[in-house]
Amino acid sequence: IPNQPPKEFEEGTEFYENYVTGGYFRSSGHDGFMREFVTIPKNRVVKYETIPSKVAAITEFVSVGIHGITRMKQVAHSRRNRIVVWGSGSLAYVVATLAKEKFPNSTIIVVGKNHDKLRLFSFADEVYDVSEIEDGFTFDHAFECVGGTGTQEAYRDIIKHIKPQGAVVMMGVSEFEVPLNTRDILEKGLTWVGSSRSGREDFEGAVQMMERPQVHS
């Protein structure tokens, strides 16, 4: 687990280790895993049994998706008929896969721009090119997985089409400040949550998910 919370961090509370002040992330502003000798506490290691090594290599990435799913479950109201994953990249693919598993009674929708990548989301219930969605298109909650220069456009479209009192989990990273239509956010009573990186519980959830043959195949 690359995330290292401070020694005084108390596990099992309402606070997440990946946001606590004083923590750090190995290989991002701190010495990481390319050193000749890597020394880490035992609680920074999560064991797996049957996951193929080439799949286990993306455990940290999957754990980020698990964390986003957890945040959504905490803040989203009980009407979860239609959940959208906005984006067509690798993060969107992981989050959509997890959402399909974690929200079995929901219609999982993917909206993106890249036609070739969108074809890979064959497991999703609905897949749309963002340029083709109609004014009547709606959903209850959203995962934003775009990031970069496309973040502003993604936020604008999500705000336009989401139903009132929906939750938006922001997962895409932009290096630039992104303006938001606060008037419509307030008018619709939307809940916005930032989700970044992950902790031990998320790694354990990722391993549990990836141990299943139908997932890692």
What name fits each language-model region?
Residues 1-46:
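Glycine-rich phosphate/adenylate-binding loop and adjacent beta-alpha elements
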Residues 3-6, 120, 213-217:
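Short, intrinsically disordered, charge-balanced linker/junction segments flanking boundaries
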Residues 51-131:
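Mid-domain Rossmann-like dinucleotide-binding core that forms the NAD(H)/NADP(H) cofactor-binding site
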Residues 65, 139, 155, 203-207:
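A general structural signal for well-ordered alpha-helical segments in protein cores
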Residues 74-80, 101-106, 118-191:
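Glycine-rich cofactor phosphate-binding loops and adjacent beta1-alpha1 units
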